Amino acid sequence: MRKTLLKASVLCLMLSGFISRASLFAQSDPTGKKPITSTYAITNATVFAKPGSEGSKATILIKDGVIKGVGSNLSLPVEAKVIAGDSLFIYPGFIDGASQAGITKPEDPKRPDNFDSSKPSDEIAGITPWRSAVDQFSIDGSQVDAMRQAGFTLIQIVPEGGMIAGKSALVILGDDKSTNVIKENTSLSSNLNGARGMYPGTTVGVMAKFRDVYKNTELTKNRTATFASNTGVVRPEITPTYQAMMDVISGQVPVLFEVGNDLEVRRALSLKNELGFQLILTGLEEYENVIDLLKSSGTKVLIQLAVPDDKAIKAKEGEDESEEVKALKARVKASYDKAIAQAGKLEAAGVPFAFTTIGAKPNDLMKSLKTMIEAGLSEEAALAALTTNAADILGVSKFAGSIESGKMANLVLATGPIFEEDSQIKHVVVDGKIFEYETKAKKKKEGAEGSGGAIAGTWDYTSETPAGSSGGKITIAKDGSSYSGTITYDDPAGSGAATSDLEDISYEGSSLTFSFGVSAGGMNLKVDVSAEVSGNTMDGSMIIGEFGSFPISGTLNPTLIANK
């Protein structure tokens, strides 16, 4: 029922013109026509073949989705379409170790009339190892567009679900006319989240249930072998759960275990040590206290490609702030500094790691990575986490993770060195298909206050949708060092205009960000807006939960000033 309402809400929003397809993401073939050639030569670009390598001028020859050559004196076939790369910097396509881009959660099963919360069925309790992320994935989702624009070309998709959600898979973010599936059943997705209002509802209960499922699968496997080779033996009971768990207990696929902090890391490791399954830890957010344990255990690690919100620590001190408030801000800053320095400490300890983007906004991924670099992570380690380390962890180094002849043509083409402040991604090549993105000249930051122009006032904004153009007004007022405001939009219920308060307004350099809520079809949706301000105009995108990123633009009305 919840999923039905959510779909209805999104449909209402789309029909009202509030959200749109990502038209900012201008792809290389807007007409949808089949390209006349599958052979490309990107000439005289600065190529970084792998982390740690120095950039060198080279040409990359691509044919049928495969890199055919990398060098300065390549002989190019006559059918090759030449792309001048003189001002471009090329990197291996980024790899996401665990992603839910393009994933839609299946509807929750209906509880029977005689439901017993102490003995729920596996499916109702969130134990669904037979489910596949491929069945929940769509390449058409705007989240996929946003991830690709951020440089990601290959991702391990993770199914939505409960404590044992199902089978992950490897997909490329390529042509929507292809299945894009590289490999199904790459890992079993699991976590320590209990079921609501039923067993197992606690972390201890989840661990006990996982142990029970694992052990019963082992027994079923042994009994099946005995039944197949002997007569007079009772037939074993084979359930969908036990059947789907067979690859895990036989060591053919690892368990991708989501853990957020050091305690959850220890619990997942204890299950692994007791039961003997292969393990990849994902979603690590607070892990400094277990870095030595991660190193000694040799566990494969995917950390969150996200950093905590820093708005609170950047707020200016007020003259009337109490010592208690100042002390609280100091503790918040210390906690923030500790969080962003963890990746650098993981590198220093010699623990190879990659990233998961689950829970992060595509538009913020590079910003988060640059923050980690400023806090001590080397650029080489950052690039390795996006490429070679991720390929090693996922077992795809044979065809991905670096720029070499014979590997898949997955590339990121940027306007400058990838971690430089003003560098932007201009092209992304996925499986030989070239996607092109708009780049804009960015102004450098000039202190905490925005340099892109004043933002206080009333903005007329528009958003292009499948139903046409629609919009409203954004009103922003400045009060000291902070901002407040409202936004109007077409009410999804069809009753005229609706208004919502703006939250978390931030304006630094030329970058404006804020969020607000939309009520539609009985659901509350959070919208995050990120835009670049230039004079009296802004252009950017808005992210709506799992539905991805959509374009928004606006013009400041100078006659309607909202300063306090």
Regions found by a protein language model. Give the residues of each.
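Active-site core of metal-dependent hydrolases
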Residues: 158, 231-338, 353-356, 392-394, ...
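Acidic, glycine-enriched loop/beta-strand segments at the rims
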Residues: 28-34, 47-59, 72, 378-386, ...
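Central antiparallel beta-sheet cores of small beta-barrel/beta-sandwich binding domains
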Residues: 454-533, 539-555, 563
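Polyanionic/metal-chelating signatures
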Residues: 140-286, 424, 430, 437-438
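Bacterial Sec-dependent N-terminal signal peptides
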Residues: 1-30
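Histidine-rich, glycine-flanked metal-binding segment
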Residues: 32-33, 38, 47, 51-93, ...
